[in-house]
Amino acid sequence: MKEKQTLQLSVFVVCFFMLLLAGWYYFSKQKQAVITVVERDYDYVMKNDPIGQNKTAPTDYYTLVLSWSPAFCDNQRKRYGNQLPKSLEYQCGTTQHFGWVIHGLWPQNGKARRVSDHPRFCQGDLPMLDHALIEKYLPESPGANLLQGQWEKHGACAFDQAENYFEKQRELYRTLQLPHYELAKNDLFRWVKKNNPALKDTYLGASRNELFICYDLSFNVMDCPRNSSY
């Protein structure tokens, strides 16, 4: 009996250490993937942006833009084949698997008729953010270039600090229940409204692979304008 207990204890100890080793390996690979992304130049250059700056447009509401990552990555692979740019390796490489991710939180002009009518680059061309700050928000916005660009283009029009902007969009994102599989637009709307009571009677927006949820200036859910130019 004693020998059996000793054997069981030995098996337990071995399994425990194997589990620890597997966990260490997984998180080291995760960290390695993150380091690969942020150890590079991910600055966003305003003069190269095709839409440009609009620092006089008012902010009347916000749009949280969520992207279905598998579809986004499929499009990137069609474009680049096996030669993905470094900026896409974290999101679309083989080490990570994302579903719905944050594209950005956009201050919006309620009277906009085109994308350029919305607030953009309100603080001008900003310096590259610290690596540690970028790493913190990669789980929900899986790209250093994405985070840097969204801060410069959109976040700086409503927030004084990048961290406050990233915290707010992550806070909104984490209140949501989102499907783990792809759905057609109307099915997606039904699923989201059924599983998020706060959105039940709310008009949502969508593009081909993105979902739009709108908020007033106090970050209460509101109907997205039906003819909005995102």
Please give the residue ranges for each predicted region:
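Secretory/periplasmic and organellar redox-cofactor proteins
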Residues: 11-13, 22-23, 32-33
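Ser/Thr/Pro/Gly-rich low-complexity linker/stalk segments immediately outside membranes or between
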Residues: 28-42
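N-terminal Sec-pathway targeting helices
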Residues: 2-14
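Alpha-helical structural elements
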Residues: 19, 37-39, 57, 63, ...
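Betabetaalpha-Me/HNH-type nuclease active-site subdomain
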Residues: 47-140
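Amphipathic alpha-helical interaction segments
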Residues: 32-34, 76, 159-160, 174
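C-terminal, well-folded lobe of enzymatic/effector domains
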Residues: 15-25, 41, 129-230
